Amino acid sequence: MQGRLSSWLVKHGLIHRSLGFDYLGVETLQIKPEDWHSIAVILYVYGYNYLRSQCAYDVAPGGLLASVYHLTRIEYGINQPEEVCIKIFVSRKNPRIPSIFWVWKSADFQEQESYDMLGISYDSHPRLRRILMPENWIGWPLRKDYIAPNFYEIQDAH
């Protein structure tokens, strides 16, 4: 079943995959990394003027990484704004996604955090750097296959 936005994208020949709806009825779409920037601009022009959040996660150990964007279409006089969730999956060997900083400025620190924790590079981001971990930190702490360097678990002696 396609939602309103998915139907509009199909009508205009924009390639995507509908992943269904969440429990609140928000449609989730999968977009290819190479199509993301142009579709992001189209969504902004279409009225999705607010990036509510961006996050990333590791799908499975040794598998894909995902970058997730929650967009909202805010209009004056509308009580229930339209929302959409965009997911972009990338290989962990070369995790590159176009930055949407130039479309929604609020992506700035969110994309930096995703880079810092999972190693996803956001192409053309003006300040992509580590913001939570030290600059010399090795690895990506939120990846499921990450092994913390020099880490020893302390257990209670009960």
UniProtKB/Swiss-Prot annotation:
EC annotation from Swiss-Prot or TrEMBL: 7.1.1.-
Recorded catalytic activity of this chain's protein: a plastoquinone + NADH + (n+1) H(+)(in) = a plastoquinol + NAD(+) + n H(+)(out); a plastoquinone + NADPH + (n+1) H(+)(in) = a plastoquinol + NADP(+) + n H(+)(out)
Keyword Plastid belongs to the record: yes
The keyword Disulfide bond is annotated on this UniProt entry: no
GO cellular component: chloroplast thylakoid membrane
Transmembrane regions: none
GO molecular function: NADH dehydrogenase (ubiquinone) activity; quinone binding
BP GO annotations: photosynthesis, light reaction
Keyword set, alphabetical order: Chloroplast, Membrane, NAD, NADP, Plastid, Plastoquinone, Quinone, Thylakoid, Translocase, Transport
Membrane topology per record: Peripheral membrane protein
Pfam family, one: Complex1_30kDa
Top-level EC class as recorded in UniProt: translocase
Tree of life domain: Eukaryota
Compartments (UniProt record): Plastid, Chloroplast thylakoid membrane
Entry coiled-coil feature ranges: none
InterPro entries: NADH_DH_suC (IPR010218), NADH_quin_OxRdtase_su_C/D-like (IPR037232), NADH_UbQ_OxRdtase_30kDa_su (IPR001268)
Primary role: NDH shuttles electrons from NAD(P)H:plastoquinone, via FMN and iron-sulfur (Fe-S) centers, to quinones in the photosynthetic chain and possibly in a chloroplast respiratory chain. The immediate electron acceptor for the enzyme in this species is believed to be plastoquinone. Couples the redox reaction to proton translocation, and thus conserves the redox energy in a proton gradient.
Quaternary context: NDH is composed of at least 16 different subunits, 5 of which are encoded in the nucleus.
Family: Belongs to the complex I 30 kDa subunit family.
Protein name per the record: NAD(P)H-quinone oxidoreductase subunit J, chloroplastic
Species this protein is from: Phaseolus vulgaris
Taxonomic lineage of the native organism: Eukaryota, Viridiplantae, Streptophyta, Embryophyta, Tracheophyta
